[in-house]
Swiss-Prot record:
Main location: membrane
Similarity comment: Belongs to the virB2 family.
Name used for this protein in its record: Protein virB2
GO cellular component terms, A-Z: cell outer membrane
Organism: Agrobacterium tumefaciens (strain 15955)
Signal peptide: 1-19
Subunit structure: Interacts with host plant RTNLB1 protein.
Protein encoded by which gene: virB2
InterPro entries: TrbC/VirB2
Organism phylogeny: Bacteria, Pseudomonadati, Pseudomonadota, Alphaproteobacteria, Hyphomicrobiales
Length: 121
């Protein structure tokens, strides 16, 4: 127990305030630079206004078109290729195959099911 007394840190107000001042003075240049950069580079936000733009149905339709288009088809092909490679090396399980095939069915079947239920074109 005596060996720990040599390394014991005695904190009082003076040493604690000195430690805090050392930390603050070492961080001051970077904090000052960050504050100066944020003040000098501020400007109006380039966000879309709430009143203008498109309605939510158009945005959802654009997302569906993106997912069900060539991007989604590429993802489906890559998933099937990954299953084939996994199966070739003996790493594929029935759960993996069911998950990928189920995801593809849900991804491409949701649009058809939604149009069928709502009577859309």
């Amino acid at each position: 127990m005596r060996c720990f007394e040599r390394y014991r840190l005695h904190l009082n107000r003076l040493s604690l305030s000195n430690a805090m001042m050392r930390v603050i003075s070492s961080c001051a240049p970077s904090l000052g630079g960050a504050m100066a950069w944020s003040i000098s580079s501020c400007g109006p936000a380039a966000a879309q206004s709430a009143g203008g733009g498109t309605d939510p149905a158009t945005m959802v339709n654009n997302i569906c078109t993106f997912i069900l288009g060539p991007f989604g088809q590429s993802l489906a092909v890559l998933g099937i290729v990954a299953i084939g490679i996994s199966w070739m090396f003996g790493r594929a399980s029935l759960g993996l195959v069911a998950g990928v095939v189920g995801g593809i069915v849900i991804m491409f079947g949701a649009s058809f099911l939604g149009q069928t239920l709502t009577g859309g074109s």
